[in-house]
UniProtKB/Swiss-Prot annotation:
This is Enolase. It comes from Thermosipho africanus (strain TCF52B). InterPro entries: Enolase (IPR000941), Enolase-like_C_sf (IPR036849), Enolase-like_N (IPR029017), Enolase_C (IPR020810), Enolase_CS (IPR020809), Enolase_N (IPR020811). Mg(2+) binds at residues 243, 286, 313. One of its GO terms (cellular component) is extracellular region. It is found in: Cytoplasm; Secreted; Cell surface. (2R)-2-phosphoglycerate binds at residues 164, 338, 367-368, 389. HAMAP family: Enolase. SUPFAM superfamilies: Enolase C-terminal domain-like, Enolase N-terminal domain-like. It catalyses: (2R)-2-phosphoglycerate = phosphoenolpyruvate + H2O. Its main location: cytoplasm. Catalyzes the reversible conversion of 2-phosphoglycerate (2-PG) into phosphoenolpyruvate (PEP). It is essential for the degradation of carbohydrates via glycolysis.
Amino acid sequence: MYIEIIDVFAREVLDSRGNPTVEVEVMLEDGSIGRAIVPSGASTGKFEALELRDGDKKRYLGKGVLKAVENVNELIAPKLLGLNAYDQVYIDNVLLELDGTENKSKLGANAILGVSMAVARAAANSLQLPLYKYLGGVNAKVLPVPLMNVINGGAHADNNLDIQEFMIVPAGAPSFREALRYGAETFHALKKILKEAGHVTAVGDEGGFAPNLKNNEEAIQVLIQAIQSAGYEPGKDIFIALDVAASEFYNEETGKYFIDGSEKTVDELIEYYKSLIEKYPIISIEDPFDQEDWEAYQKFNKEVGNKVQIVGDDLYVTNVKRLQKGIELKASNSILIKLNQIGSVTETLNAIELAKTNNMTNVISHRSGETEDTFIADLAVATNAGLIKTGSLSRSERIAKYNQLLRIEEELGDVAQYRGLDAFYSIKR
């Protein structure tokens, strides 16, 4: 199969935080068009591929992306014209060679990823296939269990909570549609509880609430209360997941972690997590240690990795080399997958494949700076990942992904699978 790319064009648009980002359109010879917008993170891992920003303080506080846009229009486009849009791997390799750096700092990961995603969309549209079927083939059928970020802290909020995300996980639901309902009803119950306690119920970047509470544990207790208030059973219908983002409160000089008002050593932090795991139905903990603290991950995984999903985000940055190291060290049993951490569709699929073949789960993830683009919803189903993290139950850029998953579930009909607890295949529950 062969279809030529006849046009590649990029423009500067805005993300959900009002910051510029890159949108790319790719046109094929049959008139098919693929469009994609690149997301952007707030708490970024130091090993992520480079997001190119202009640095011109007179425009968008230095966050403009005209250089990345120019790189697409002037440097990338001429190289792709006439190439076969159906050969995603070849096209992504052309992009990587054109950039030639380890972290995509020449062209920018935001330029490369925008093109990579848009090519995939254009090819799918040309074949009149849904994106998940194009990327995943006939066996793409698993709807993901959502990890819904309803209380925000850390770098995502201006409050006193250290842990970045407190999530509800409706793994006990029979279908994705019902899981979404469980989540939405719990979200509304949570809002009512916070309001009655006198907390502000404005939402943060990812659509969750950002109350000032006594400590991190109180946030978990409030979630349990909300789950019960919505008529569900914690630990049966709905579980809890945490994204600690520990690199954000790690002190490199002392080697300690500042959490809940005091400094903790690695061993003290592990005991803190273990006490939470024993008290509450916590099914997943992301980035519990600094992104270079491999030993802490190894120790923690050895102690609790059989019953709790330990997710590496900043640890791996969707990078096959770092993931391979984690596999060899047995550092975690799960990886967070973010397209823009690595910067191309092919490399993302490679990371997912490597994790799967080593019995690690994949959690497909959004970024805090998102857009209306729903690529990750299709990616989750395409790869049968079984898990997705795409924010709370408010803000259209988050809901867009959930609504796309509803459409996919409907389209798949009886073939659709929602695996619930079985999606957490790297642990025993």
